[in-house]
Swiss-Prot record:
It is an enzyme of class 2 (transferase). One of its GO terms (molecular function) is UDP-N-acetylglucosamine diphosphorylase activity. Catalyzes the last two sequential reactions in the de novo biosynthetic pathway for UDP-N-acetylglucosamine (UDP-GlcNAc). The C-terminal domain catalyzes the transfer of acetyl group from acetyl coenzyme A to glucosamine-1-phosphate (GlcN-1-P) to produce N-acetylglucosamine-1-phosphate (GlcNAc-1-P), which is converted into UDP-GlcNAc by the transfer of uridine 5-monophosphate (from uridine 5-triphosphate), a reaction catalyzed by the N-terminal domain. Keywords: Acyltransferase, Cell shape, Cell wall biogenesis/degradation, Cytoplasm, Magnesium, Metal-binding, Multifunctional enzyme, Nucleotidyltransferase, Peptidoglycan synthesis, Repeat, Transferase. Pathway: Nucleotide-sugar biosynthesis; UDP-N-acetyl-alpha-D-glucosamine biosynthesis; N-acetyl-alpha-D-glucosamine 1-phosphate from alpha-D-glucosamine 6-phosphate (route II): step 2/2; Nucleotide-sugar biosynthesis; UDP-N-acetyl-alpha-D-glucosamine biosynthesis; UDP-N-acetyl-alpha-D-glucosamine from N-acetyl-alpha-D-glucosamine 1-phosphate: step 1/1; Bacterial outer membrane biogenesis; LPS lipid A biosynthesis. This is Bifunctional protein GlmU. It comes from Yersinia enterocolitica serotype O:8 / biotype 1B (strain NCTC 13174 / 8081). PANTHER family: BIFUNCTIONAL PROTEIN GLMU (PTHR43584:SF3), NUCLEOTIDYL TRANSFERASE (PTHR43584). CDD domains: GT2_GlmU_N_bac, LbH_GlmU_C. It catalyses: alpha-D-glucosamine 1-phosphate + acetyl-CoA = N-acetyl-alpha-D-glucosamine 1-phosphate + CoA + H(+); N-acetyl-alpha-D-glucosamine 1-phosphate + UTP + H(+) = UDP-N-acetyl-alpha-D-glucosamine + diphosphate. Gene3D superfamilies: Hexapeptide repeat proteins, Spore Coat Polysaccharide Biosynthesis Protein SpsA, Chain A. The active site is at residue 363.
Amino acid sequence: MSNSSMSVVILAAGKGTRMYSDLPKVLHPLAGKPMVQHVIDAAMKLGAQQVHLVYGHGGELLQKTLTDPALNWVLQAEQLGTGHAMQQAAPHFADDEDVLMLYGDVPLISVDTLQRLLAAKPQGGIGLLTVKLDNPSGYGRIVRENGDVVGIVEHKDASDTQREINEINTGILVANGRDLKRWLSLLNNNNAQGEFYITDIIALAHADGKKIATVHPARLSEVEGVNNRLQLAALERVYQSEQAEKLLLAGVMLLDPARFDLRGELTHGRDITIDTNVIIEGHVTLGDRVRIGTGCVLKNCVIGDDSEISPYSVLEDSRLDAGCTVGPFARLRPGAELAEGAHVGNFVEIKKARLGKGSKAGHLSYLGDAEIGSGVNIGAGTITCNYDGANKFKTIIGDDVFVGSDTQLVAPVTVANGATIAAGTTVTRDIAENELVLSRVKQVHVQGWQRPIKKK
């Protein structure tokens, strides 16, 4: 292996016709982010000095979606093959760097495999990622003489004898920038497809006396590409199965690994239990002994020790201290914070609000733009009226406050410690400490009331 720096080229110019979509193929999501983003992330983890993204179809949308300033955008106006794509990027290659070639629609390539490929590359030669298949039909074959790689022949151009070869080209390779630029300049399109094949550089390198080293990926799924939605769905299942296996081996109890989706990163403590059909998005941290019920969605959350999220609750950009309970059917929106032992029950929505230690909102309530103290009881149907149609206002509730059912708190308003709000009250003014507040229409009784009769 050379000691030179390394850059990466990601080919992402294809139309993806078989996806039957207006979305560029490489932007279709896998595990919650675009396919090509998985490849970009791998390149960054490798320590690439620069990442060149070769684009064509849907370039404007690609650039709008992939906002990493480290990307160097290279246009391939016509799709004339992989060799042609690399020719567009070649002017950006430094002579003394290694250039690693990856694909935007091969999303599961691992950093470990790429590190082995870089390590195996001979000084001045080429590192080539290959696999052996029981049925290699349709793939380029690795041609060897006396064990040494001398070329790659595409399936359509292969002889009957060459088609018996079961070692195939994955398309992933690494070579020196100076040599690669020269070989790319020598490519032609005299083949059955009429395209410029990057694979032809293998024969050119052999003719120059360069060594070609091969490496196999740890798993076949690492080099499987996506051309249609069926293949994308299959790779999604492969990815999720791998993530579930890692979590199980790390001590997380997934009650059904086949019905768990990780679409981000999960940091966890000990003795976690996750029921079926749970989705984890973004960055989620679970403390010790956390229990997640079936059908929950957690995105960018921190969940404290001994907390429980009951079924079908949705939490986003929220933070729970130890011993909290949420749900079932609760929604915590961005900015929701629950102090130790707080409880949020069914059909309660919290947004940009903090619920203090031991406080409870059990049923059918909306708490937005609020600061709620400790030991507070929020009755069913309580609403913080935080929006006047133009601006948001805050509700402040002190400690040990009792809020009766069907209460409306019209912000901005402050409720002091120990206050009691009777059921059905609309609060429009601040409430002092230990006050009882109620606002109701006087109850009227009409004896012998006759209900209206429906006209026939």
